Design a protein with these regions (language model features):
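Catalytic-site neighborhood detector that most strongly recognizes the C-terminal catalytic loop/helix
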Residues: 65, 73, 127-134, 147, ...
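Short, polar N-cap/turn motifs at the start of nucleic acid-interacting alpha helices
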Residues: 116-124, 196, 215-235, 257
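Short, basic (Lys/Arg/His-rich) helix/loop patches that form interaction surfaces
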Residues: 13, 80, 84-94, 103, ...
């Protein structure tokens, strides 16, 4: 609201954005472009719904590029290389990356984690619904290896965030720079960079290798926090906490034999 009032958009806009307007600014990032389009269109639709604008200038904008589904799976050797080198990075990025590898959480879930989301024994991270992608609370059991990392983290003096460079006032940020630093360290240690990968590929890789070692697909889905769809989502509300705990410990033992 304040943004729309500040720019003083006329209720009837003289110009509309078209697909042709997007040609010059495409730079090979269809995923990011699609997200910008989605949220910008939603913002203008809010203005239309509240009678601040007559029409949505982004209503007819389509995604010009298909978003390619990522299928990068890191091998166990690659994952162990990432783990080993991440351990040399120090706080916050070293333990942050290692916890993502052990739990399969999305990068924002540990980045925004609060200290009081950990139970007193540090056996699990309890993410409130308001902070989880599915809008449902998620309990993340911590393996023995994950508990060891969590117990070694420094306390924060000024705020709730576990991973922070501001004493807990703000969550850690700068993922791209941290990933670039990690890649550089890997190249220095091994003599060559790993084939292209992104942080989210760690989550997919964990799921793939968990299935390889015999963990049931529905337990893997529960570990990832995926919501059951259809009738199953309506009637099945068992948390699988014990099964998730066992599965994530098995995965930790596989990653760190």
């Amino acid at each position: 609201m304040s943004l729309l009032e500040e720019v003083r958009c006329p209720r009837s806009m003289a110009m509309k954005s078209t697909n042709g307007d997007t040609i010059e600014v495409r730079r090979g990032g269809p995923g990011s472009a699609a997200e910008v389009r989605k949220w910008t269109r939603a913002m203008f639709q809010f203005a239309v719904d509240n009678e601040l604008l007559v029409e949505n200038p982004f209503a007819d904008i389509r995604n010009r590029d298909k978003q390619r589904k990522r299928d990068r799976i890191l091998t166990m050797d690659e994952l162990r290389t990432v783990w080993r080198v991440a351990g040399c990075m120090g706080y916050p990025w070293g333990p942050y990356l290692q916890l993502i590898m052990l739990t399969g959480d999305r990068r924002g879930e540990w980045a925004n984690a609060h200290a009081d989301w950990l139970d007193p024994g540090c056996t699990r991270l309890e993410i409130p619904a308001a902070h989880y992608k599915t809008d449902k609370p998620q309990v993340v059991p911590l393996s023995a290896q994950a508990r060891e990392i969590v117990s070694s983290l420094p306390g924060q003096e000024f705020g709730p965030f576990i991973f922070s460079t501001t004493g807990g006032l703000r969550p850690v940020s700068g993922f791209s720079k941290a990933k670039a630093r990690l890649d550089k360290l890997i190249s220095a240690e091994t003599g060559a960079p790993l084939p292209h990968w992104v942080i989210h590929d760690l989550r997919r890789s964990m799921a793939t290798h968990m299935e390889r070692i015999g963990i049931a697909p529905h337990i893997i889905e529960a570990c990832l926090g995926h919501v059951l769809k259809g009738v199953a989502g309506t009637y099945r509300h068992y948390s699988y906490l014990a099964e998730k705990t066992d599965a994530l410990q098995r995965w930790a033992n596989e990653l760190l034999p």
